[in-house]
Regions:
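OB-fold and OB-like single-stranded nucleic-acid-recognition modules
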Residues: 21-169
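N-terminal Sec-pathway targeting helices
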Residues: 1-9
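C-terminal motif of bacterial Sec signal peptides marking the signal peptidase cleavage site
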Residues: 17-18
């Protein structure tokens, strides 16, 4: 009678140990965030999260401000070894990975310069509207300037986010 109880006890200890070991796997970067990975993103339902937090390294080929949603759009030519982050749709942006810095993060996430070699950290997503993969939002960019969004930009984005929440809820 004691043998089945011992077997069950050993099984439970092994399960608990496996769960503990699984939880202790380090994230790919200390810049990964908890919570909703798409918090603050305009129209998040168009994005499918492939991974909550990924690292990408490459050279910036283009930086553009998107006035509608206030994002800073970065086209990143990936270093060798990071190509798996791309989809066929990324061919429409020159084979680059799209990286987006959202307005609420512009006070703490650097905006890189064209030609800079950078590392970025953030959720790796598929943009269903455009059909390409992105890091969106970028939670950390290794080089660039902090360019906070203006009060007017933040207000406009807040209205967009509120209207989007009303439209989808």
């Amino acid at each position: 009678m004691r043998r089945p109880a011992a077997v069950i006890g050993v099984f439970l200890v092994c399960c608990a140990a496996a769960c503990t070991l699984r939880r202790q796997v380090a994230p790919p970067s200390p810049y990964c965030r908890g919570g909703n990975p798409l918090a603050g993103v305009y129209h998040p339902s168009r994005l499918r999260v492939n991974s909550r937090c990924r690292v990408a390294v490459g050279t910036v080929s283009k930086v553009a401000f998107e006035p509608y949603d206030g994002d800073v759009h970065v086209d990143l030519r990936l270093d060798r070894g990071y190509e798996s982050l791309l989809s066929d749709g990324n061919d429409r942006v020159g084979g680059n990975l799209v990286v987006e810095v959202i307005p609420f993060d512009r006070s703490r996430v650097a905006v890189p310069s064209e030609g800079a070699r950078i590392e970025v950290v953030g959720p790796w997503v598929e943009d269903d509207q455009h059909g390409w993969n992105e890091i969106h939002p970028a939670w950390w960019v290794s080089a660039g300037r902090i360019e906070p969004a203006t009060t007017a930009e933040l207000r406009a984005v807040q209205l967009l986010l509120q209207n989007n929440a009303t439209d989808s809820g």
